[in-house]
């Protein structure tokens, strides 16, 4: 007999009750005023949800099994496969934090309809963690150079730039539950998952990788519900005018945090780790963030009094350069990574100049020097080209080189009795709003200040099983591999740029 979905959903809602024998206490208190009236836009029932997700899992894992039989892992362009090592180390943490966010919202939001949506999303995020870890395992077992795929959380926690990912994804779970919802569902999932889970898989497929699209597009099929959860939560709290300034502040904060990490990181993977490029990240950002998120999603919220994020114009100014500056910083310090890099060929450089006019004037000489330093017999790494390493921002933990090193927005300010660096006005503003949130951050330089680079690499575990060859390499050539002895000969000392 056919079931009436609305009646079944209403029956499930009837199981909710308000206890009279105990005074409810907020486990995760919120400063937002949350009205009781709200709607779950999908009206999901667990029985239907499980059947739908089971079908998707069967398709995905069945394809991955077939891909192994066709030796697809070794048909992927190696340059592209290497970028999956940091990506698949960082993403499970983001998904795990997203799942914990749903638990916070279930506790904080006294509305059975929204809670039902949060429950389905919590199950989704658990599934996504498993999918991404499995994809890393798939490549670790079947890819020609698995070193680095096995490091996971250990790897990204110790990397200078990848650890900035943790700093951003912690905003999904650290703080006010409604703010976490805005950071995750309204900004992270609605603005940035399309570039990650739709555009990036297209790049993967163009480079011979069909496993990543299978997994990522399966994940993205859940994201529409997560966006709906965010929209329903946002509209609910917007219905109380007292919340508007709090929501606008959260919008301003978390859009900038998402931009400064995701656009730098994902833009680097898309443009610098592709052999067969289907487009540049700058254009993908225009399509998915500006046209789709700002032009469609944000425009619908203007009637509630919500404005586009305060720092959107600065993000637009950054986009032509941000991933190039991030790539230069990452490639300059390639030895402290757990994946291999590749030199940029003349064809690569021509592509960059064509898609980012002026690129060669600002970055071309660096890439020429990088190419000449790829051989360990040259006895130099690109970081030695610079008088010092760039300071790391106290808030976002990214290097203060944006939009470009020659026109960076670095601010070095005395705060709480110590010199602190900020990459932008936005990050300094966030620090001043909640200094206690960021004072405990010990950045990468502070951890390793005064140490020899070789000792740091050994401590981080970025060494291959032979005990001497580095996991990271500045090239993909199986010959002329760098060893820890090559690094020791450099006598390169890690120096905190803000050392007193």
Give the positions of each predicted feature.
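Extended, helix-rich structural scaffolds rather than catalytic motifs
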Residues: 1-38, 244-376
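Alpha-helical scaffold segments that form or flank carboxylate-/histidine-based iron centers
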Residues: 6, 34, 39-44, 83-87, ...
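Conserved alpha-helical segments that form or flank metal/cofactor-binding pockets of metalloenzymes
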Residues: 13, 17-65, 126-151, 231-234
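Long, hydrophobic/aromatic-enriched structural stretches that serve as scaffold segments
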Residues: 55-113
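Acidic/His metal-coordination segments adjacent to aromatic residues that form catalytic metal sites
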Residues: 66-89, 148-187, 206, 254-276
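Long, hydrophobic, well-ordered secondary-structure blocks that form the structural core
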Residues: 88-163
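Inter-helical turn/loop segments and adjacent helix faces that build the functional surface
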Residues: 104-116, 138-145, 171-179, 198-218, ...
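Intrinsically disordered, low-complexity terminal tails and linkers in eukaryotic proteins, enriched
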Residues: 343-419, 423, 428, 436-500
């Amino acid at each position: 007999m056919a079931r009436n979905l609305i009646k079944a959903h209403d029956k499930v809602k009837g199981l909710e009750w308000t206890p009279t024998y105990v005074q409810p206490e907020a486990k995760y208190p919120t400063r937002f005023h949350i009205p009781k009236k709200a709607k779950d836009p999908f009206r999901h029932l667990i029985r239907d949800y499980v059947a739908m997700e089971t079908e998707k899992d069967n398709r995905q894992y069945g394809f991955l099994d077939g891909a192994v039989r066709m030796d697809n892992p070794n048909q992927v362009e190696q340059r592209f496969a290497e970028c999956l090592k940091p990506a698949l180390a960082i993403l499970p943490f983001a998904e795990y934090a997203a799942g914990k966010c749903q638990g916070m919202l279930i506790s904080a939001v006294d509305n059975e309809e929204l809670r039902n949506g949060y429950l389905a999303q919590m199950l989704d995020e658990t599934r996504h963690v498993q999918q991404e870890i499995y994809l890393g395992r798939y490549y670790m077992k079947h890819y020609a150079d698995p070193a680095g795929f096995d490091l996971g959380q250990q790897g990204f926690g110790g990397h200078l730039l990848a650890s900035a990912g943790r700093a951003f994804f912690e905003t999904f779970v650290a703080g006010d539950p409604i703010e976490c919802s805005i950071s995750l569902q309204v900004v992270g999932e609605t603005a940035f998952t399309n570039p990650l889970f739709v555009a990036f898989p297209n790049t993967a497929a163009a480079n011979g990788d069909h496993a990543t699209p299978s997994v990522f597009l399966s994940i993205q099929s859940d994201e529409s519900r997560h966006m709906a959860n965010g929209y329903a939560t946002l509209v609910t709290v917007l219905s109380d005018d007292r919340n508007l300034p709090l929501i606008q502040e959260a919008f301003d904060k978390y859009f900038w945090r998402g931009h400064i990490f995701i656009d730098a990181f994902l833009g680097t993977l898309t443009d610098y780790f592709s052999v067969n490029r289907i487009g540049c990240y700058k254009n993908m950002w225009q399509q998915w963030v500006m046209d789709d998120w700002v032009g469609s999603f944000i425009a619908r919220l203007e009637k509630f009094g919500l404005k586009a994020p305060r720092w959107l114009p600065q993000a637009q100014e950054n986009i032509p350069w941000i991933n190039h500056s991030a790539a230069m910083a990452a490639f300059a310090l390639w030895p402290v990574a757990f994946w291999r890099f590749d030199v940029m060929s003349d064809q690569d450089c021509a592509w960059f100049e064509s898609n980012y006019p002026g690129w060669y004037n600002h970055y071309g000489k660096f890439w020429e020097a990088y190419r000449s330093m790829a051989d360990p017999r040259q006895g130099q790494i690109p970081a030695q080209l610079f008088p010092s390493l760039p300071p790391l921002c106290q808030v976002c933990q990214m290097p203060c080189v944006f939009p470009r090193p020659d026109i960076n927005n670095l601010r070095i300010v005395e705060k709480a009795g110590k010199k602190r660096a900020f990459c932008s006005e936005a990050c300094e503003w966030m620090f001043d709003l909640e200094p206690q949130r960021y004072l405990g951050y010990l950045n990468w330089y502070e951890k390793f200040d005064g140490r020899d680079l070789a000792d740091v690499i050994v401590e981080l575990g970025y060494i291959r099983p032979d005990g001497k060859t580095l996991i990271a390499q500045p090239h993909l050539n199986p010959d002329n591999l760098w060893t820890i002895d090559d690094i020791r000969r450099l006598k390169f000392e890690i120096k905190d740029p803000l050392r007193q």
